[in-house]
Curated annotation (Swiss-Prot):
Pfam families: GAGE (PF05831). It comes from Homo sapiens. This gene belongs to a multigene family expressed in a large variety of tumors whereas in normal tissues, expression is restricted to germ cells. These genes organized in clustered repeats, have a high degree of predicted sequence identity, but differ by scattered single nucleotide substitution. Their sequences contain either the antigenic peptide YYWPRPRRY or YRPRPRRY which is recognized by cytotoxic T-cells. Belongs to the GAGE family. Residues 103-117 have a biased composition (Basic and acidic residues). InterPro entries: GAGE, GAGE_fam. This is G antigen 12H. Disulfide bonds: none annotated. The gene is GAGE12H. Residues 1-117 are annotated as: Disordered. Residues 32-45, 87-96 have a biased composition (Acidic residues).
């Protein structure tokens, strides 16, 4: 018995090596704090807290995020649902109802242009 045909298995092609970035993920202030050194005031200049407005904002952001903690979920849920002008009530359990089946919903051309509320 002889083998006929072509194999359906193909060897994987060699992958091209891509140099990974130096850091993966969000940068945190402690990771780059040693790179940015605060400007030292000269003898003739009065010492100010922060001369760079971007660095001043960074300092404010650090203090604000450290004291508040995570935002409440109820606030984030409100932002997730944009108001469309047609505010429907929640279901009888207080939970949101599932969206209607698109096959059952009539388009304005098919129906008499009634509100779905």
């Amino acid at each position: 018995m002889s083998w006929r045909g072509r194999s359906t298995y193909y060897w994987p092609r060699p992958r091209r090596y891509v140099q990974p970035p130096e850091m993966i993920g969000p940068m945190r202030p402690e990771q780059f704090s040693d790179e940015v050194e605060p400007a030292t005031p000269e003898e003739g200049e009065p010492a100010t807290q922060c001369q760079d407005p971007a660095a001043a904002q960074k300092g404010e952001d650090e203090g604000a995020s450290a004291g508040q903690g995570p935002k409440p979920e109820a606030h984030s849920q409100e932002q997730g649902h944009p108001q469309t002008g047609c505010e429907c009530e929640d279901g009888p359990d207080g939970q949101e109802m599932d969206p209607p089946n698109p096959e059952e919903v009539k388009t304005p051309e098919e129906g008499e242009k009634q509100s779905q509320c």
